[in-house]
């Protein structure tokens, strides 16, 4: 996506306009003391927590890709006590470690006390035989005999065509008939036109899409949400903070929100925006520390939808924020590994932070600390990352621009005169 088109999307005045009620709203049930609010699944007695625990960004051990089990276990305990008993993992998450973690840490709880969601990695499937092998592997890793919610993972036009060719839906429906899947849906990264085709193809139990107040028009999330709502398909939301971006707004936007609600986090505004949509069943959050979890529990306990005045406040904050954002990366890391080792999401995070804070010194120091093979200049424009990017970012073009900016800043002595707070340095 070109930056011009990106900013044009942000400028759309309807970005925060309330969506029409195209179908019956999910019924919210009163929260018990210390627990998050819940919503009913369609017209059944099944209730699910409005907050779901995403397992793509679990805490890691220092200087290691390994999951910090001690910290994660403590967070799971806290979540379960607060009624946050929906856990979302996937075959690829955290280098394949996420499903193992789910099995290792959740198996101590009674199986009927929590909901477990995982996904068939359509991109990894080559033949129909792979379906059985991968599904059984997932059950083993998660130490379970069934998944409460299961998805075709990250569908787009090509993934959907492949799924039809290999009979993925039919295979998973057999697993559902065997009791190994309770609810079958899909997660999605493409245009509303493709979503219309997929949503119309089968009687899906739910769908997982990217929704947040930044992408409501930018990523055409509103159109996607309305398609699913018209078809009475409950929505599970991913990327409500857009990869953490909406939790770290620039000072101007943050000030607007804090003036309106002192003591409330930027993240709480983003979660309330998503939770205010009537057909949203669960909002996922990839929490990496106890502070994130505690703040989210506070937001979703006795949940209240945004008022018209609060929507106007959020609109004003978005207007202030849009001036500083450079690259619409959510840090999903689907672009990795880069064949030549470029640290794509890390570079984008550095650059966006610099644009938001104006601290060129922090950017040049952190970018310059990367190995040369990890910098944008090492990109060979093979295009592998572009095909994998759910945001459709022209990654080679952005890397080239960022590397040019870095070299230009490095030549300027002013870049090194800025104060560099420790928290803005990237390790």
Please describe what each predicted stretch is.
Residues 53, 89, 118, 149-152, ...:
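Conserved beta-strand positions
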Residues 41, 53, 87, 102, ...:
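Conserved, mostly hydrophobic/aromatic
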Residues 1-114, 171, 177:
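N-terminal binding-site loop/beta-alpha segment at the start of enzyme catalytic domains
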Residues 57-69, 120-129, 256-260:
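Active-site mouth loops of central-metabolism enzymes
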Residues 123-241, 248-255, 261-262, 276:
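Glycine/proline-rich, positively charged
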Residues 223-427:
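Structured C-terminal cap/extension of enzyme domains
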Residues 93, 108-132, 153:
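Structural motif corresponding to the early beta-alpha repeats
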């Amino acid at each position: 996506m070109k930056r011009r088109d990106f900013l044009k999307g942000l400028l759309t005045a309807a970005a925060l306009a309330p969506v029409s009620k195209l179908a019956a709203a999910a019924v919210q049930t009163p929260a018990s003391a210390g627990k998050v609010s819940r919503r009913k699944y369609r017209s059944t007695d099944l209730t699910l927590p409005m907050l779901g625990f995403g397992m793509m960004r679990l805490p890691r051990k220092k200087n290691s890709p390994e999951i910090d089990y001690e910290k994660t276990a403590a967070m799971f305990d806290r979540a379960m006590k607060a009624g946050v008993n929906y856990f979302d993992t996937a075959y690829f998450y955290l280098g394949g470690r996420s499903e193992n973690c789910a099995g290792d840490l959740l198996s101590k709880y009674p199986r009927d006390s929590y909901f477990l969601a995982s996904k068939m990695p359509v991109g990894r499937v080559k033949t129909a035989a792979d379906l059985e092998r991968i599904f059984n592997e997932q059950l083993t890793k998660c130490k379970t005999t069934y998944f409460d919610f299961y998805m075709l993972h990250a569908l787009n036009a090509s993934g959907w065509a492949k799924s039809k060719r290999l009979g993925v839906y039919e295979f998973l429906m057999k697993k559902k008939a065997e009791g190994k899947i309770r609810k079958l849906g899909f997660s999605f990264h493409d245009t509303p036109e493709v979503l219309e085709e997929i949503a119309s193809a089968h009687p899906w139990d739910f769908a997982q899409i990217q929704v947040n107040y930044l992408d409501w028009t930018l990523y055409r999330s509103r159109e996607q949400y309305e398609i699913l709502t018209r078809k009475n398909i409950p929505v599970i939301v991913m990327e409500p903070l857009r990869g953490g971006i909406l939790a770290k707004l620039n000072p101007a936007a943050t000030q607007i929100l804090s003036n309106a609600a002192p003591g409330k986090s930027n993240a709480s505004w983003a979660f309330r925006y998503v939770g205010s949509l009537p057909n949203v069943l669960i909002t996922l959050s990839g929490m990496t520390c106890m502070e994130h979890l505690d703040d989210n529990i506070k937001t979703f306990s006795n949940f209240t939808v945004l008022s018209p005045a609060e929507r106007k406040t959020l609109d004003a904050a978005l207007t202030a924020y849009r001036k500083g954002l450079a690259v619409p990366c959510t840090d999903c890391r689907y672009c990795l590994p880069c064949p030549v080792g470029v640290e794509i999401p890390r570079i984008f995070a550095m650059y966006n932070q610099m644009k938001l804070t104006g601290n060129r010194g922090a950017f040049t120091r952190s970018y310059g600390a990367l190995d040369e093979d990890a910098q944008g200049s090492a990109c060979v424009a093979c295009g592998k990352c572009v095909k994998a990017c759910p945001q459709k970012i022209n990654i080679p073009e952005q890397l080239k621009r960022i590397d040019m900016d870095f070299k230009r800043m490095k030549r300027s002595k002013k870049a090194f005169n800025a104060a560099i707070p420790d928290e803005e340095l990237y390790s």
